Amino acid sequence: MKDMDCIPGPKPLPVVGNLFDLDLDNALQSIIRMADEFGPLFQITINGQKQIFATSQALVDELCDETRFHKAVMGGVEKLRMLAQDGLFTAHHGERGWGIAHRILMPAFGPLRIRDMFEDMSDVAHQLCFKWARQGSSASINIAEDFTRLTLDTIALCTMSFRLNSYYNSETMHPFVQSMLYVLKEADLQATLPGVANCVRVKAQRRMSKHIQAMRNIAGDIIKGRRDKPEPVDDLLNTLLNGRDPVTGEGMSDELIISNIITFLVAGHETTSGLLSFTFYYLLQHPHVLEQARNEVDEVVGVGPITVQHLAKLPYIDAVMKESLRLMPTAPAFTVTPKKPEVVGGKWMVNTGQSVHVLLPVCLRDEAVFGPDAGEFRPTRMLEENFSKLPPNSWKPFGNGERGCIGRAFAWQEAQLVVASVLQTFDLVAEDPYYKLRIKETLTIKPDGFRVRATLRRGQSATALSQHNMSAGATASPGSSTHLAGDENGQDTAGGQPISFFYGSNSGTCKALAHRLASTMMTRGFTDQHLAQLDSAVDNLPRDQPTIIVTTTYDGQPTDDAKKFLAWLESGNVPSLHGVSYAVFGCGHQDWTKTFYRIPILIDDLMHKAGATRLTTRGTANAAVSDLFSDLEVWEETNLLPALREKFYLCNSSDFEPLDPHQLQISISKPARVGMHRDLVEGKVTAIRTLTSPGVPEKRHVEFQIPSEMALRPGDHVNILPVNPPCSVLRALARFSLASDHSITFESSNALDLPQATPVSAAELFSSYLELSQPATRINLKSLASATPSDDDKKELLHFHDSYDSLIRDKRVSVLDLLEHFTSITLPIATFISMLPVLRVRTYSLSMAPSFKPLHCSLTFSVVNEPAWSGNGRYLGVGSNYLASLTPGSILYVSPRPAKDAFHLPTDQSSNPIIMICAGSGLAPFRSFIQDRMAWLQQGKPLAKALLFFGCRGPHLDDLYHDELSEFESAGVVEVRRAYSKVPNHYLAKGCRYAQHRLLTETETIQDMWAHNATLYLCGSANLAKGVKAVLENMLGTLSEERYITEIF
C-alpha cells in the first residue's frame, strides 16, 4: 500500500487541543473557515479527541457507503444521550433499543400516514396565520421563535394528539422548549470544552440535569395522560405504547418510549423551524424569487383552501426549500466511522474508532458540483430536471441511510404547507432592510435576530381570515376506506377468477396500494383473491393466474418483508417460473436518485430472467411529485386491465362501469346577476400574477380568454362585473345575524333591480347584488338617525349630515360602516337593502393588444387595500380585490367599452410618432399600444418613433413589465425612459423621481418628434397630468386636444 498522507489541520495545544481556534459562541463558523484553509479533509483536537471533517461531495459519496461506514454518536450528540439515551437519534450503532423502536415506528412515518396528518398540520399553520393577522402589519415578528412554536405544536398534535398551545402564550416559550434550548446549547459547549473544564462547571452540570429531568417528566406526563385516558386514535403515541417489534415481538419500555418522545419533540421541530426561517430570509433577500414562489401558490391554490394534493403541484416552492436547506442545512453535520480501517479520497487513512464529520454547510456548496455560484441562492438548480442530474450524495441535509431522518416526509410536508400558507396570506417585509445574516448555533442553526412584518394580502381583515376556512384539511386518504381483500397473513377470498397480490412494505404504503388494487379488481371479476407479503411468495408463486407485485426500495434495499423473496430470486436456485404471469408496480422518491425504483426494477428483471411472463410494462409512482393512488389507477386502466383482458379473457362487462351521465340530468345557466347588465360575455382566466415586490402597493396582471364577438382596440376599456370582498360580506351577515346560506326572497323590490320571487342566499345577495362600500348619502344619514333610540348617536349622525362632504363622502364612509359604529341603530334588513345601490361594473384599461394575442385580453391594476380614510379598518377596492382573487380557470363576466376616438393609435403607425407618459398601472393602455406596434412590425411594416415615459418607485419594486419592455426596446418598437421616486440616482432614472421630470431630460427629442406631428398620450392621476402639462406647455407651447390626449383616473 502506498504511503498515506497525513490529515491536515491546525496544530493542537497540550490539554486544550484546538479550543482556542474556536469561537465558542460560533464554533461551527470557526470550523467552516478552517475548511477554506485546510481543504476537503482536515482534523482538529477537541476535548482530547481527534475529530475529522469532510467537506467535498466526492468524500461524502464515499462516507455514505453503508457497507464501509456507519453512524457514530459523539460530540454534542453523545452528550445528548443524557437526555435521549437510546432514542432513534442518539442510539449507538447496533444498539438493541434502536432496532426495536425503528421497526415499530417506520410504518408510522409512511407516506399515507403523513398525508393523514395534513389536517392537524393545517390547524397549527392557521394558528400562526391568525396570530400574525391579529398583531397587525406594524408588529415586529421574530420569525425563528414563531416557527419554533409552530413546529413544536405541530409535532405534538400530529403524532401525540397533544396540544401545547404555544401561540396562546406569546411572552414565553413552552417549558419544554426553554429546557431544550438550554440542553442543546450546553451539550454543544460540553462537547467543545476539555473534560477537566466540564468537571469544574458544577452549576452548569446541575442546571443541565435539572432541565433534562424536566423534559423527561413532560414526556412521562404525556404517557401517563394517554394511559389514564386511552384514545382510539392511530397516532405515533399509541404506536409507541402498544406497538410490537415484528422481529422480536417485544414492545418498548417506558424509558425507551420517553427517549423517543423527546427525540421526536426535539428533532421533529428544531430543524424544521430553522428551515422555515432560512427559507423566508432568502425569499426576502431575493424579491424575484419571492414573486415567482408567490405566483406559483396563487396559480395552483388561488385563495381557496390549501389541500394535501396541492403540495405536489408546487415544484418551485419545493426547489426554494431545497436550495435554502442546501445553503443552510439546519442540522449542519452527521458523523460516521469506518467498520474497518478505510482509505478515503485515495490518500487518507481513517482507522476504526475514528469519526468523520460530514460538514454539510461546506459540502453542499461544493463548486465541483454546484458551479462557481455555489454560494448563491438560485432555486432553479433544485428543480427536478436539474436536481435529478446531481452526482450521488450531493444533497444530504437529512443524514444518510438507515440512520437518516425518519421524519423527513413529515418535516417536508409541514414546511411546504407553511411556506404556501404564508405566501398565500401575507406580504412579508424584513423589519430591517439592511439586516445581515447572523447564525444562532446550538446543535442546530437558525437565523439570529431576523425579524419581519406581515401584511394581509387582498385586503383581508384578521376577523375575515379567522372566519374563512383557509384549508379544507387533508382529504381522506384514497386508501383509507378501502375494503381489504385478504390480510397480511395471506388469507384468501373465494369465488370468481383467481388473482394474487404480493407487497413489500415497511411503512404500510405499498401494502395499502396492494389492498386498493385488490379491492378494485374485485369489481372487475377477480373475486378469488390471495394477498400477502412478498416473502410468502418464495417457492410459492402461483401459475395460471395473474400475480401483481407492489413494492418499493428502502435505503437501496428491499423492505423487511421482501428480503427473503429477493434473496431467493438472486440465489440462482429459482426453478423455472414458466407459467407465472406477473406485473410489478414500484414506488419511490426522486430525492434518492441513486436507488430510485431499484428494488422494483430488480424484481421485475429477475422474474423475467427466470422465465416468468410480464403481463405489462412496470408501473411506477414518485411520492415526491404525485399522488400514489392516482398513479396506480392510471397504470391499472392503461396497462394492467388491457393485459388482463388479453391474457385471461377478462371481458369488458366485468369492468367497473362509471356513472351513466344520462342518469343525472343537470343544466347550467349564467348567474342571474349577469342578466342585470348589458352586453356581458363570459371570460375564462388563463393567467394571473403579481407584478410588484412586497412592501409597495400591490399591482397585478390578469389575463383571460374572450369570445370572438367581443371587439376591442388598443386603448379601449373593459367592464368587469365584480363581487364584494368576502370580509365585507361577512361584516354584513354578522350585522344582521344571518348565516351565509339563509334564503332571502324579494316579493317586490320596487325600483331595485333585484331578482323577483327567486330565493337568493344572504351571502350571494351581499356578495353579488349590492354596493356595500358605497358612501352613505345624506338621506341615508337621516334614516339612520331616525332609527336609533340614542340621543347622542342621533346627534352625531345629524352632525355627519351637516358636514357630509368632509366626514362622509371624502372619507368613503358606507352605511355598513355606520351601522357597525352606531350599534344602537335598529334597522330592518329590507331598509338596509333599499339604501344601497345595485352592484355596478368596474372599468379597466385594456393592457393587451388583440393583434398580439387574438381572443385574449389582459388587465393591469392596482389592488386597493389601504387604511380606511375614516380611520377604522381598511378600505378594499371592490373591483381590484375581486380580480386579485381570481385563479386560472375562474370565470368572470366582461364587456367592451370603447375609449374616446382620440385615445387610439394613429391610423398610420409608419409616419406618426407617439409619446406616452404614465405612472404605475397607468402603463396598461400603453402596453397594448406597444404590443400592437410589435404586431405591426412583425408584418414587415416600418414604425415611426415611439417614446414611453414611465414613473414608479424603483427597479425590483414596481417597475412593471420591465423585461418585456426591454425586449420591445431591443426590437425597435419603443424607447423607454424611466423615473424612480425611491432611487432617482439609478442609472435608468437619470436623477429623476417622476415622469414629468424625466421629460426634461429628453427635451430635444420631444421637440423634434412634436415637429414631426407626434401625438402625446397620458394615462395617470390628476397630479401627474397637472405636472406633465406644465412641463410640456413650457417645452412645446399650447397643446391641442387633438394631439395631447389624456385619461385621468
From Swiss-Prot:
Its EC number is 1.14.14.1, 1.6.2.4. Gene3D superfamilies: 3.40.50.360, Cytochrome P450, NADPH-cytochrome p450 Reductase, Chain A, domain 3, Nucleotide-binding domain of ferredoxin-NADP reductase (FNR) module, Translation factors. Binds 1 FAD. Binds 1 FMN. GO terms for biological process: mycotoxin biosynthetic process. Residues 499-640 form the Flavodoxin-like domain. Pfam families: FAD_binding_1 (PF00667), Flavodoxin_1 (PF00258), NAD_binding_1 (PF00175), p450 (PF00067). Its cofactor is FAD; FMN; heme. It comes from the Eukaryota. GO terms for molecular function: aromatase activity; flavin adenine dinucleotide binding; FMN binding; heme binding; iron ion binding; NADPH-hemoprotein reductase activity. It catalyses: 2 oxidized [cytochrome P450] + NADPH = 2 reduced [cytochrome P450] + NADP(+) + H(+); an organic molecule + reduced [NADPH--hemoprotein reductase] + O2 = an alcohol + oxidized [NADPH--hemoprotein reductase] + H2O + H(+); dodecanoate + reduced [NADPH--hemoprotein reductase] + O2 = 5-hydroxydodecanoate + oxidized [NADPH--hemoprotein reductase] + H2O + H(+); dodecan-1-ol + reduced [NADPH--hemoprotein reductase] + O2 = 1,5-dodecanediol + oxidized [NADPH--hemoprotein reductase] + H2O + H(+). The keyword Flavoprotein applies. Residues 461-470 have a biased composition (Polar residues). Residues 461-491 are annotated as: Disordered. Keywords: Electron transport, FAD, Flavoprotein, FMN, Heme, Iron, Metal-binding, Monooxygenase, NADP, Oxidoreductase, Transport. It is an enzyme of class 1 (oxidoreductase). The keyword Acyltransferase does not apply. Residues 471-482 have a biased composition (Low complexity). Residues 678-906 form the FAD-binding FR-type domain. FMN binds at residues 505-509, 584-616. PANTHER family: BIFUNCTIONAL CYTOCHROME P450_NADPH--P450 REDUCTASE, NITRIC OXIDE SYNTHASE-RELATED. In the N-terminal section; belongs to the cytochrome P450 family. Self-sufficient cytochrome P450 monooxygenase that catalyzes the regioselective in-chain hydroxylation of alkanes, fatty alcohols, and fatty acids at the omega-7 position. Performs hydroxylation of C10-C16 n-alkanes and C12 and C14 fatty alcohols; and thereby enables the one step biocatalytic synthesis of rare alcohols such as 5-dodecanol and 7-tetradecanol. Converts 1-dodecanol into 1,5-dodecanediol as major product with very little sub-terminally hydroxylated products with the 1,4-dodecanediol and 1,6-dodecanediol more abundant. This is Self-sufficient cytochrome P450 monooxygenase CYP505E4. The gene is CYP505E4.
